């Protein structure tokens, strides 16, 4: 959902097309993301719960695709949103009102390092052997008042 807001999914201006012999490498890509130089996410595409072929097969049964369509999937661990046992206990408590749950959730999330204006996000995707290297994508978070 969050990737669908305007400006929330920077992509391009280039599209990397794999050579046929490089297609197997999509199952061994290192995915790294830093915020202000601090590594926040580090994973490998081999850890995906649903592989690209499975995802494309399932989605193509539900919708049509056109050349250039961008398919967004999940994310690697390390995002700011965190739910611990206490959070789950609060959210699943049927005695607590919906409004109180939201208030408690928001309050407990304040300690997490969400993005702020001025933060610099840098990400890289490349195969372990270096055959595929998508370069570096760097963006500065701008706060709009």
Model regions: which residues?
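Short, Lys/Arg- and Gly-enriched loop/turn segments at beta-strand edges
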Residues: 79-86, 105-108, 128-139
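Low-complexity, intrinsically disordered Gly/Pro/Thr-rich segments
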Residues: 118-128
């Amino acid at each position: 959902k969050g990737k669908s807001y305007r400006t929330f999914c920077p992509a391009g201006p280039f599209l990397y097309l794999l050579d046929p012999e490089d297609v197997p490498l999509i199952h061994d890509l290192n995915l790294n993301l830093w915020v202000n130089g601090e590594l926040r996410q580090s994973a490998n595409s081999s850890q995906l719960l649903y592989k690209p072929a499975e995802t494309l097969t399932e989605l193509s049964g539900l919708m049509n695709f056109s050349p250039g369509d961008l398919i967004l999937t999940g994310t690697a661990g390390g995002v700011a949103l965190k739910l611990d046992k206490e959070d789950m206990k609060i959210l699943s408590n049927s005695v607590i009102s919906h409004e109180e749950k939201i208030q408690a959730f928001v309050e407990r999330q304040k300690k997490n390092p969400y993005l702020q204006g001025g933060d610099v996000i840098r990400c890289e995707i490349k195969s372990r052997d270096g055959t595929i290297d998508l370069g570096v994508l760097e963006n500065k978070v701008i706060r709009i008042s």
